[in-house]
């Protein structure tokens, strides 16, 4: 087994490689030679060299591309929801690319998150629209209706199983006035924690279903939970998450046994991936109705 990191300096890719005994492939000037009998873990890259593409790839790059782009991701989930037959939907917030609709939401009393950067992380490129909003909506490729949340989680999923679960918790070294409860990231006073984990079952279920919906083999799913609605909402999936401690151990355990299951990838899951890859290239394929049973996606 090999690992292709999105950048050579990825500490998590290095740690995972050491844990499972996998060699890392250089992102440039590599002498790696691919073949169908080799397995490569794609660690967050939306493009892979020709030699790597000759191998069995865990998290194909076209699907990683969809996951890394917030608008593509929401559209992919929306299309999955529109064509699933068993009513098992991935819950996502309302979204639009239409600034007029975003303005309407604000004037109707909602808070809207304008996303200026589709591939940003840690709150990068976010602008909140709320209250007495008299100006025109800022020009942005994506607007998402804000959902109030009781908790925010990161659920690590690998091969259809939750390998670790973290909660975003307040840092106590940050003053009250510097805490931003709406955008919970490190700069706004939050860290990942495992204490006081009382996680609704729907959180894990939504994380697993979101990965299945776009054909990801693994990913760290960011989810918020609205207690009043008793609903978990999927926000995004990270395909190159930070790995330390218990999180790293969970991934190592799953990847050590991975080659036993990739031989039996369901035909319909492969078809779903082709659909997602078409979306990544900007071509809209005609999706086939699917239903989800366990890890398998079957016609």
PLM feature segments, named:
Residues 111-113, 141-143, 218-221:
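A short linear hydrophobic-aromatic micro-motif
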Residues 117-202:
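Phosphate-binding site of ATP-dependent enzymes
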Residues 212-216, 225-299:
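C-terminal active-site "lid" helix and adjoining low-complexity regulatory extension at the edge
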Residues 157-159, 223-227:
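Short, low-complexity Ser/Thr-rich regulatory SLiMs
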Residues 112, 161-164, 219, 233-236:
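Protein kinase-like catalytic core scaffold
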Residues 2-108:
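Conserved N-proximal alpha/beta basic substrate-recognition cap immediately N-terminal to
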Residues 45-47, 117-119, 240:
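Short glycine-rich anion-binding loops that position phosphate/pyrophosphate groups of nucleotides
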Residues 203-212:
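A short, acidic, amphipathic alpha-helical segment used as a generic capping/interface helix at domain edges
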């Amino acid at each position: 087994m090999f690992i292709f990191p999105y950048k050579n300096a990825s500490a998590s890719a290095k740690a995972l490689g050491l844990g499972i005994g996998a060699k890392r492939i250089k992102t440039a000037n590599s002498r790696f030679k691919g073949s169908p009998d080799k397995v490569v873990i794609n660690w967050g890259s939306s493009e892979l060299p020709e030699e790597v593409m000759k191998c069995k790839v865990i998290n194909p790059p076209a699907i990683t591309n969809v996951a890394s782009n917030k608008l593509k991701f929401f559209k992919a989930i929306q299309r999955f929801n529109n064509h699933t037959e068993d009513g098992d939907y991935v819950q996502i917030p309302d979204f639009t690319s239409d600034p007029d609709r975003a303005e309407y939401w604000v004037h109707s009393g909602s808070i809207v998150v304008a996303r200026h950067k589709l591939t940003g992380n840690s709150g990068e490129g976010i602008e909140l629209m709320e209250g007495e909003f008299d100006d025109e909506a800022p020009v942005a490729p994506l607007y998402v209706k804000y959902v109030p949340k009781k908790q925010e989680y990161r659920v690590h999923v690998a091969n259809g199983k939750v390998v670790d679960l973290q909660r975003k918790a307040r840092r106590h070294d940050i003053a009250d006035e510097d805490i931003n409860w709406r955008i919970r990231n490190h700069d706004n006073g939050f860290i990942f924690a495992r204490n006081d984990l009382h996680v609704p079952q729907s959180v894990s279920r939504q994380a697993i279903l979101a990965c299945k919906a776009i054909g990801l083999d693994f990913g760290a799913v960011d989810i918020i939970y609205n207690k009043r609605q008793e609903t978990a909402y999927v926000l995004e999936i990270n395909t190159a998450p930070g790995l330390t401690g218990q999180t790293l151990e969970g991934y190592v355990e799953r990847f050590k046994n991975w080659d036993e299951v990739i031989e039996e990838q369901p035909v319909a899951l492969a078809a779903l991936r082709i659909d997602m890859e078409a979306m990544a290239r900007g071509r809209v394929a005609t999706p086939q109705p699917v239903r989800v049973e366990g890890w398998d996606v079957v016609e």
